[in-house]
Amino acid sequence: NKLRGSDRPQRIFDAVRAVIDATGILKGKRRRALDSTLLDDAVATQDTVTQLVSAIRRVRRLVPEAAAVSVTAHDYDASGKPVCAWDDPDAKAALVSGLVNDARAIIDALDGIELDDLQGDAVGLLALVAGQDVEPGDDEGTWRIAQRVAPDRVISTVDPESRHMHKSRSVYRDGYKAHVAVEPDTGLITATALTPANAGDGPTGVELLAGEERGLQVLADSAYGSGPVRSALAEAGHSAAIKAIPLRRNPKLGSDQFTRDDFVIDHLARTATCPG
């Protein structure tokens, strides 16, 4: 983390690249393979109540003005979760609404107050978790858990940059994603990146090739095969040897289905004609 937060987070690879350039070991090698892997986070995913309580406690601890705000949903100086009949939907809904109102009261009270970086980050995180999982309730001034998941949801106030990602429909992971660009013949890693787990492979892969000369052949799986990524590679002067996205049929609908290969594509007219 110290290296990542320094003014030269890529210093190790800068040194490696300097050696590569000096030796000329990659001279004439015009292929790069792109890939990524998920890195599990050590922190547990938090529910909405846990996030709200944790974020409010932190702001009250860091900002004296926040500690002076009157809050009623929970004793934030006490350890543990709020007292609640968790199997009672109405009681849980009332608690969530109260916590959100406490958070909003604190945020409103701090408007215009000068904050340092640590305090500002804590208040910003509180504002985020106070809104990402909820929506206005039926009565004025009330809130309820929204029946949707925020696209870039923070999963833990302990590690706000960690994200949730579905590896498949039934397999999911929480954490980060490591991306690499590799020269396949020598195995030398030419570029790396670390992103939240929900970051797309394709756009990050394009960034990994930003310092390369034109004319590479890019090897990758179908995660890098979107139209915008292929277009970006072409604009950068590279050719793509990327596995096509597999054809899939809905197993619940039987065999009378079309795939993309069944459509007639006219690139000049920019039309796609359905075979049906």
State where each predicted segment sits.
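Helix-centered, glycine/charged polyanion-binding patches within enzymatic domains
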Residues: V229-G276
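Polybasic low-complexity intrinsically disordered regions
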Residues: N1-S222, G227-E235, I245
